[in-house]
Amino acid sequence: MSNKLTHFAIHIDDIERAKSFYDGVFDWGFNSYGQADFLQIKADKSETGELIGALQARKFSPVSEKLIGLECTIGVENLDEIVERVKNNGGQLLLPKTAIPYVGWIAKFLDTEGNLICAMQYDNSAR
């Protein structure tokens, strides 16, 4: 399929803090990739987990300003559980669980690095 998002990078200031946050919230796995301040993100912690993105230091940016980036939404099975994990792992909830009618439930939060992240529990009966 053409024009499909195939990778994302979450820009970070502290690699270990960000790794701990995303492990605690989404239970993702991580691989070193030969660069300091850069980790591949895997969809799970298995040896063969699908590579879906990266944590990377803001210094890899080609622009001098602090990168803010895209608003990415991560599909989850249980949004209430994810919201609790965000709170318990140092994130800041910006938008509590909110219905998007006929689509699902969304919450928005800042991670420990100040990035805006969305989590969505898809449910066409949401009202």
For each of these PLM feature ranges, what is it?
Residues 1-4, 64-69, 101:
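Short glycine-enriched loop/turn motifs at secondary-structure junctions
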Residues 2-5, 9-50:
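Core segments of cupin and vicinal oxygen chelate
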Residues 3, 10, 34, 83-127:
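Vicinal oxygen chelate
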Residues 40, 73, 106-108:
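Short hydrophobic/aromatic beta-strand element in the GNAT-like acyltransferase core
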Residues 50-57:
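A short, structured beta-strand/loop element
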Residues 65-92:
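Mid-chain, well-packed structural core segment of small domains
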